[in-house]
Amino acid sequence: MWLRNSVFLIIIVVGGIGGFPAVAAVCPDWDNTRASKEIDALRQQLEQWDDVYYTEGKSPIEDDVYDQLREQLNQWSQCFQPQNVIPARLPDNGKQPHPVAHTGLKKLSDRVQLVQWIVQREDLWVQPKVDGVAVTLVYQHGKLVSAVSRGNGLQGEDWTEKARLIPDIPHLLSGAPSSFVLQGELFLKMTDHRQYAQGGVNARSIVAGEMRRHQPSPVLSQIGLFVWEWPDGPKAMPERLDKLKEMGFAMTADYTHAIESFADVEKWRDHWYHSPLPFVTDGVVIRQTKEPQGRYWRNTSADWAIAWKYPPVHQVAEVVDVAFSVGRTGKVAVVLKISPLKLDDKSVSRVNVGSLSRWKQWDVLPGDRVSVSLAGQGIPRLDNVVWRGTERPVIVSPDEHNFHAFSCFRYSVVCQQQFLARLVWLSGEHGLNLAGMRDGMWLRLMQHDLLGDVLSWLYLTEAQLNAVNGMGDKRARDIYMSLQSARQKSLSHWLLALGIPVPRSAISALNNVNWLALQQRTAQQWRQFSGIGERRAEEIMAFLNHPIVMELIARLDLEGIHR
């Protein structure tokens, strides 16, 4: 029920419902010059997308992302330029007048506001908010004589010829009034579409594109019609639905249900969100039967109907910061810290970018807007950078040349992250399995300058541990015993703890073999073990013959750890 020609007004809400909390709009901390630059730049970008949308009939970005950026622009304008209203630009060729104006829908998401709206009205009905493009159909003496796009609500494009090629739009009606007007949604017909899992799939843009093509395509046969308004139609909703069904508009009756409370609306909203449907939806519409006469309708929000939208599959968030971490093997990972948002039932404030090189390709910095969705197993995924701020802050990233498979076996300020990652791996279940030694404990020892390299802890005394702030006698004793238990571990456990790149399927290759024998193995001999190919064999041999690893093994040998 929405096309890119509506005027969006910012709605600031304070509550949330249905597991989808609303977030109050916060004005950016910008001076007027910066605000003007950002507002102008985003407005120009939206206008470029509008031009593509109207001239080529396709959307360069997802519909729900466009909607959110349009709302973002209006929010900024409310903050810094409240005297200006920034509507979406309309196509130049929308000159066909509507016999009855298309109204808009006020969108509510606050529980208190929704309940209040419902209790103040009677004879209410709920429908799915079908996501397509709005149209006016005019019938005279049972014959379709006009079809007009929504446009600005007062006039739009003449779609009559295209409408006559859509099988789902009846051309001739029997038993119809002599002259009447319908308003509805042209949608892309789907098979068992589940909104919660599949999202909008840009169905709206596909329909809009087809309706603006000069030459018809097979897509026309995939377009359906959902009638949601009959200006000056039967007064009672049951009579209105029966008459629509009799004339060939049965879908409206199938998906319009009486409600008496907010709980009823919530039930249908959840049902349609998860159930297979023949169309894409982006929420529900709650409407009262009583409406003013069509001649009084205006292209503003109606007061007899409201929308309660679903959370978008792709949510737009501001990038607050860029965080870098260096892992055990020296790989630099990048994570974006974003303004908190809700995806399904998950609160998300961080999203993984991947490698340093990928972050540079994304060119994403604080102040940018990114599109985020849920990937498999509910993991937040960065989909795209949908808007870049006009000012590009300088972010100093780690030099990836400083980190590799053999860096940071010794502590330094630069090495802190990789060094800690090595220790966490060493004490974990894949290594020595040392009780009580997790990242927090290793950090405490590092902060007390007790760890010069990855073996320094082996020589700590109980007294040194007891001197660590907040340790206590019993805790110090337990940690000391845990650390010393490593002396009883085999050489194979130690090699795995230090990071030898032997896959778990080939761990038997390390059992009951001394250091010299391991070093003397050839690449061909290593490849005899499960999961070890040519490249992995070379990595294992490089590990066994690296000077720092050889030094560490020599120290273990002095401690009686041979095989």
UniProtKB/Swiss-Prot annotation:
Alphabetically ordered keywords of this record: DNA damage, DNA repair, DNA replication, Ligase, NAD
Top enzyme class: ligase
Signal peptide segment: none
Keyword Zinc-finger: no
Residues at the active site: 129
Catalytic activity: NAD(+) + (deoxyribonucleotide)n-3'-hydroxyl + 5'-phospho-(deoxyribonucleotide)m = (deoxyribonucleotide)n+m + AMP + beta-nicotinamide D-nucleotide
InterPro entries for the chain: DNA_ligase (IPR001679), DNA_ligase_AS (IPR018239), DNA_ligase_B (IPR020923), DNAligase_adenylation (IPR013839), DNAligase_N (IPR013840), NA-bd_OB-fold (IPR012340), NAD_dep_DNA_ligaseB (IPR050326), NAD_DNA_ligase_OB (IPR004150)
EC number: 6.5.1.2
Annotated transmembrane regions: none
Gene3D superfamilies from the UniProt entry: DNA ligase/mRNA capping enzyme (3.30.470.30), Helix hairpin bin (1.10.287.610), Nucleic acid-binding proteins (2.40.50.140)
Chain's role: Catalyzes the formation of phosphodiester linkages between 5'-phosphoryl and 3'-hydroxyl groups in double-stranded DNA using NAD as a coenzyme and as the energy source for the reaction.
Family listed: Belongs to the NAD-dependent DNA ligase family. LigB subfamily.
NCBIfam families membership: PRK08097.1
Protein name as it appears in the record: DNA ligase B
Species whose genome carries this gene: Pectobacterium atrosepticum (strain SCRI 1043 / ATCC BAA-672) (Erwinia carotovora subsp. atroseptica)
Source taxonomy: Bacteria, Pseudomonadati, Pseudomonadota, Gammaproteobacteria, Enterobacterales
